[in-house]
């Protein structure tokens, strides 16, 4: 009897809305996708963009750069974006905030949460407007400790039920760490993004080196890379240098480095990601490709 009453109420509800049961099920499918999908917010010092898996578009990914207003903070720009952004207005409940701030990497077997704040203060500058958080990188046997702006964090927390905050470089580190096992020679990686150069290397399933330099100059980038190359004792004939991202003066940079490092390579995202459809999205940063190319399961975690 109880089941009949429930069925009658459901039928009456559908009749009032002039929907049949099949239409009702179809109508809830987009809502379920919104509930389950994790929106990615990429925030740097001067840019904002949003991305989410979307099966209704050809590339299976909806990427939306946002034009920031100069003179106001990233947090203030994000508040404004919630009024106009197509993705932000969809009502996603889960978000992954990627922040581009200096990262202190701690070996996972040496990480002590009670000591990390003091260690961070000795290594980095923590502004009053920032709060310090950490993120475990299990594949790399490290913990990333970094700062996030309090106002930016508050804006995201106010709009989403489930929020994760990760370093912008996490996807790049993980992707290139997997590729580092190809071949027997040592490899140095240089990733260019947002007027910043990230240089890092791996060995025995962990970081051997990682540092970042603020530059958009190909000449300065070349100097920084070769300085690290020499510091790490790499072989200029046998070992490998891999460049990726938004490389300034790409042809000049590669040719200039080839004079000193014979095995210098520039990543081709189309080949790197096996012709994945997302590589055709104009303006999609390499770091976002590394997150989404593995599919909806990884991007929604």
Question: At which residue positions do the language-model features occur?
Answer:
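N-terminal Rossmann-like FAD-binding beta1-loop-alpha1 element of flavoenzymes
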Residues: 1-18
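Hydrophobic/aromatic-enriched cytosolic interaction surfaces used to assemble or bind macromolecules
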Residues: 19-301
């Amino acid at each position: 009897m109880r089941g009949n009453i429930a069925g009658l109420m459901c039928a009456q509800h559908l009749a009032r809305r002039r929907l049949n049961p099949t239409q009702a099920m179809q109508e809830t499918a987009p809502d379920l996708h919104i509930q389950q999908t994790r929106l990615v917010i990429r925030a740097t010092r001067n840019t904002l963009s949003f991305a989410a898996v979307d099966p209704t578009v050809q590339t299976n990914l909806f990427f939306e750069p946002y034009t920031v207003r100069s003179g106001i903070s990233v947090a203030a720009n994000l508040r404004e974006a919630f009024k106009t952004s197509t993705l932000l207005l969809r009502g996603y409940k889960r978000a992954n905030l990627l922040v581009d701030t200096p990262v202190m990497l701690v070996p996972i077997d040496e990480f002590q949460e009670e000591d990390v704040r003091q260690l961070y203060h000795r290594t980095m500058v923590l502004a009053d407007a920032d709060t310090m958080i950490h993120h475990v990188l299990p594949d790399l046997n490290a913990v990333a400790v970094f700062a996030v702006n309090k106002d930016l964090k508050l804006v995201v927390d106010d709009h989403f039920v489930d929020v994760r905050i990760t370093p912008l470089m996490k996807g790049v580190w993980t992707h290139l760490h997997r590729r580092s096992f190809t071949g027997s020679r040592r490899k140095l990686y240089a990733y260019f993004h947002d007027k910043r150069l990230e240089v890092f290397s791996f060995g025995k399933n962990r970081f051997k080196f990682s540092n970042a330099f603020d530059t958009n100059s190909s000449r300065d980038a070349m100097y920084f890379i070769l300085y690290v190359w020499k510091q790490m004792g790499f072989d200029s004939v046998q070992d490998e240098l891999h460049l990726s991202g938004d490389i300034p003066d790409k042809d000049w940079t590669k040719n200039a480095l080839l004079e000193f490092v014979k095995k210098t390579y520039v990543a081709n995202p189309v080949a790197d990601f096996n012709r994945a459809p997302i590589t055709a999205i104009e303006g999609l940063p390499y770091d976002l490709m590394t997150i989404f190319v593995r599919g909806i399961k990884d991007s929604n975690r």
